[in-house]
Swiss-Prot record:
The keyword Secreted applies. Residues 19-62 form a propeptide. Belongs to the attacin/sarcotoxin-2 family. It is found in: Secreted. GO terms for cellular component: extracellular region. One of its GO terms (biological process) is innate immune response. InterPro entries: Attacin_C (IPR005521), Attacin_N (IPR005520). Hemolymph antibacterial protein. Residues 1-18 form the signal peptide. This is Attacin-A. Keywords: Antibiotic, Antimicrobial, Cleavage on pair of basic residues, Immunity, Innate immunity, Secreted, Signal.
Length: 254
């Protein structure tokens, strides 16, 4: 099944980019690595959200980007980011995402907007629909704290309004944040935490990432780490989590 998903993911990325001719060398720029939503159900006691927002790294991108992420739980995420309008410092882009469960059935779909700054700061808003749950509306921000030729440090935060379809279950919020570190666009790490007061639940993550391959238009990134959640009734162990992301930039820079 994993091999099938790997082949399917590569076909989706390559077929999308094959329609365009790339005229610019993007070597040295950071590549889109979307945080795909995991879309488990709230009532099953599993994480029901992720930072489903893509924000730019220190260099603002002016080309369309597509990505496929294969997760260790068998799920799969597709992401797209298409520039709409911008100038030398800021770019406004349209976002799109589709997440599939381990049976390749739709787990969520989302659309949104992202505003990226050349210095690595960004804002985004995204609306997601989760079959069997309801809708989620997420606003997120990212600030590039430090950047030079070797090191990059960013802080991020988000708030998600969860709007379940279940009778007698009110809307509720999830808030969270984290810190990302990258060394020479090759090796990095991230720490994250989220809090859902309505469920009296906290989620934690500690991840590492490695850029396996990079060309002017293509990037392959591996991430691995641990996640856990705490509630008054149950506390999970630190569970291993890993994924592989294929990213592709295509089209002419405008």
């Amino acid at each position: 099944m994993f091999t099938y998903k790997l082949i399917l993911g590569l076909v989706l990325v390559v077929s999308a980019s094959a329609r365009y001719l790339v005229f610019e060398d993007l070597e040295g720029e950071s590549y889109l690595v979307p945080n795909q939503a995991e879309d488990e159900q709230v009532l099953e006691g599993e994480p029901f959200y992720e930072n489903a927002v893509q924000l730019a790294s220190p260099r603002v991108r002016r080309q369309a980007q597509g990505s496929v992420t294969l997760n260790s739980d068998g799920s799969m995420g597709l992401g797209a980011k298409v520039p709409i309008v911008g100038n030398e410092k800021n770019v406004l882009s349209a976002l799109g995402s589709v997440d599939l469960n381990d049976q390749l059935k739709p787990a969520s779909r989302g659309m949104g907007l992202a505003l990226d700054n050349v210095n690595g700061h960004g804002l985004s808003v995204m609306k997601e629909t989760v079959p069997g749950f309801g809708d989620r509306l997420t606003g997120a921000g990212r600030v590039n704290v430090f950047h030079n030729d070797n090191h990059d440090i960013s802080a991020k935060a988000f708030v998600t309004k969860n709007m379940p379809d279940f009778p007698n279950v009110p809307n509720f919020n999830t808030v969270g944040g984290g810190v990302d570190y990258m060394y020479k666009n090759k090796v990095g790490a991230s720490l994250g935490m989220a809090n859902t007061p309505f469920l009296d639940r906290k989620d934690y993550s500690a991840m590492g990432n490695l850029n396996v391959f990079r060309s002017p238009t293509t990037s392959v990134d591996f991430n691995a780490g641990f996640k856990k959640f705490d509630t008054p009734v149950f506390k999970s162990n630190w569970e291993p989590n890993f994924g592989l992301t294929f990213s592709r930039s295509f089209g002419n820079k405008w």
